[in-house]
Amino acid sequence: MKPPSLPLLLLLLHLSATISAAPSLSPTPSPTTSPIPPHKPSSSSSPLDPKQLKALESLNIPTVKDPCNHRPTTKSTSSSVVTCDTSSPFRLVTSISFTNCSTDLSISTTALRALSPSLTSLSFLNCPSLSPPPRLPDSLHSFTAVSSFLRRRNGLSGVFLARLVNLTDLTVSSVPVSTSGLFVILGNMHEIVSLTISHANLSGNIPKSFHSNLTFIDLSDNLLKGSIPTSITLLSNLKSLNLSKNTISGDIPDSIGDLISLKNLSLSSNKLSGPIPDSISSIPELTHLDLSGNQLNGTIPRFISKMKYLTHLNLANNAFHGVLPFNASFIKNLEVFKIGGNSDLCYNHSVLSSKMKLGIAQCDKHGLPLSPPPQKEDSNSDYDYGNEDDTSEKKKEEHHGPNKVVLGVAIGLSSLVFLIIFMILLAKWCG
């Protein structure tokens, strides 16, 4: 009997081509991770001061091993980090940071007295059930309290904080502060450099004067009222000013331009009115400008597009009018740009594309909005080139998806046709 060489050969060739055309799945290599070197305690010839060692024990800080080299293994459990100096004959504690404090922790005056005067930094993070001690050491240069001391309704008092006259860094956030005014706290802090009192129910007016050493001020999310004092512009070293989420009113002072070291200016969610002062153009390295959620009016000044270091610009939800004076290249260079919620503001369609989704209407030939834009800025109206690219890529994937399905069906049908032809030829040959 003569074998069916031709049909069989055709079938084998076709099946071989089909298999080779199918996508191959190579085994995924197992991920490799470089081993993390174990923490090596720093060697020191001096033991820790016995009185301070006893003080750490009373604060529930482990002392079986050297507490100065102890580091917590997880972030979810109660932990403490102690830093010591290298003095002799005994080392001394310089810094303690408590995180997720246990409910049985108590900060005694006796322990703090033993740790003073070497203790210069004290931090409490997420210690809501903790009660503040009657007094903190005068030696402190840095004090931090975040989401802590919430057992009392009043949290921390202004007098309690005002005693820390040697502070250079004060951070109080999500902790109520009861005081008749910010000046009570800052009056004698002549060395203060960084000041944060945010989300603290702080009320009253902004002080008319600040200490000249300040480089960072964050008084956001409080109940501060009144106007921005012109004297704040005497802070020539100030790099960041955040007064957002208060009830501050009045104009932005023209002298704001005297803050020549400023990089971040956040005045959002207040009751500020008037135009954007031209003096802001005198701040050479401003990178973050947020004036959203106010009652600012007038036209948006052209000088903003000349600020070469600007990366974040939010002017949303104000009362600006006229034609937006920015071109596409300026907007593309910004990481964040929000302009919606200005019903009388519009853009020139010959300069900017509608695809940019700015949240404002297109201008007519008279420079007026063609249609009413959204009343409030929507988070989806941010101009983001990255999102636009992602969308186009998804469209490409959706476009190419059906082609792969059609190709698979065609290969399957052709295989079936060859099989039928082979069976017919085989039947004829056998017959």
UniProtKB/Swiss-Prot annotation:
Gene3D superfamilies the record matches: Ribonuclease Inhibitor
Glycosylation: residue positions: 100, 166, 201, 213, 242, 264, 297, 327, 348
Disruption phenotype: In snc2-5 and snc2-8 mutants, impaired basal resistance to P.syringae pv. tomato DC3000 leading to increased susceptibility.
UniProt keyword list: Cell membrane, Glycoprotein, Leucine-rich repeat, Membrane, Plant defense, Receptor, Repeat, Signal, Transmembrane, Transmembrane helix
Composition bias, Pro residues: 26-40
Cellular compartments annotated: Cell membrane
Extracellular side: 22-404
InterPro entries the UniProt entry points to: Leu-rich_rpt (IPR001611), LRR_dom_sf (IPR032675), RLP_Defense (IPR053038)
The keyword Nucleus is annotated on this UniProt entry: no
GO cellular component: cytosol; plasma membrane
Keyword Iron assigned: no
Disordered: annotated segments: 23-50, 367-399
Record-given protein name: Receptor-like protein 51
Organism expressing this protein natively: Arabidopsis thaliana
